[in-house]
Amino acid sequence: FGDYEDAVNQKDNILFHSALSPYINLGLITPEFIIKKVLDFHKSKKIRLNSLEGYVRQVIGWREFMRGIYQSYSNEMETGNFFKQNRKMKKSWYDGTTGLPPLDYAIKNALNFGWSHHIERLMILSNIMNLCEIKPTIVYKWFMEMFVDSSDWVMVPNVYGMGLFSD
């Protein structure tokens, strides 16, 4: 994490990430547990400050911010469609045969692992879905089906708000 937290590389689909989101989102481990482990590790190994701060910020800052957005605005987000997008999703979105290599790679990651790097989700998958004018509820359904860390409180603000700007 830190310097390369937003880097995407086809040789390593996790790359500088813990991939703990399924465990956190399902309630199997808590953010508090993770932060304690990270801080304990930092005491003995001295993690670079930007890496430590970036990781802690993501685990407790961003996650909790998204949860607050969901609790406060989920109804509006789930019914919003600011750009009036109404296209359906083609079969290629489910098998990774769109013909766009970065998109197909991201789809196949989701199919193979049930998980994708946050940049793949936001900058590749969501961005292209938005450019293709796919209906937000269809995009939301796709994300809920494809990822093991999918949960309403996570996907509603990330898909409707961050990914599609549909709210």
Predicted regions mapped to residue ranges:
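Generic helix N-cap/helix-start motif at coil->alpha-helix transitions
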Residues: 118-119
